[in-house]
Amino acid sequence: MEETSKLQVLKCPACNAKLTYFFEFDQVITCPVCHNRMNSHVLQTVEAHMPLRYVSPTIDVDGFKHLMAQTLVDIDFVPCDVFQAIDAEEVFCIYLPMYLYEGTYQVAWSGIGSDQQQLNGNAKGKLAYLYLANDRKGDLPKELRDFTTCLPYDAEALSSFEAGHIDATDSHVLTTLSTITAEAVWKKWGTKLTDKLAKSTVHDQIGNQKVRKLKISPTVELTNLGEPLFVPFYFSYYTYNNHRYCFIADGQGKHLSYNNPIDKRESSYVRN
């Protein structure tokens, strides 16, 4: 049975972002949205349901920093001085409420081959995806929201959730509230996900054949209708030449999202 816990909510006076923490503390807080530093703050306490399980991280803050540095090093034409703009202290960890959907899908397809022959077939597959359980746009930076809306799920990473596993003294550890039901999330995104998986499976089956008037009819059977989980992510923002850039990774370091500056002079020199 899910337990409830008291979370601390702080509204940033600079950008009005609502920041949610597991614990109350006294040190300086940095807003991950606008980077405003708050020395004094008034926290509001809210009751929230805690999930029974979470995706346990396999990298820590240092691992995230190494992943970010290595990724940028491997990208062509990244300015050499970009690392001077990255503040190693401005790395945030956030445990996002997400819903887990698992099940199987089947798809029947038909079409006309290159020789006018009628073609048809059946395919099936498994699905295991995580969807963000928060639809309130002001709660998260846009880049983080876009990245975490839907992600594949790693079954091996699940553990029982205990708030004691989280560092109560770290102001860079955040969470956010669940604001939408599992049924509403699946109604909003489930059909799109099923259609995408079905099309990919059918195209894999068809291979290089040319098929006209392709019709795809998928059905899905869920064995997990949206189990609530906490899923950790790391993210960092930095400014270079007055432009903001970000680097985001899941707690396993398997899924990344980032943008980065490009040295245009170096890039144009190589092209020429």
Q: What is the meaning of each model-derived region?
A:
Residues 244-263:
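Juxtamembrane amphipathic/hinge helix adjacent to a transmembrane helix
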Residues 21-29:
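Short linker/helix segments within small regulatory modules
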Residues 12-15, 31-34:
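Short cysteine-rich clusters marking metal-coordination/redox-active sites
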Residues 19, 38:
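Cys/His-rich microdomains that often coordinate metals
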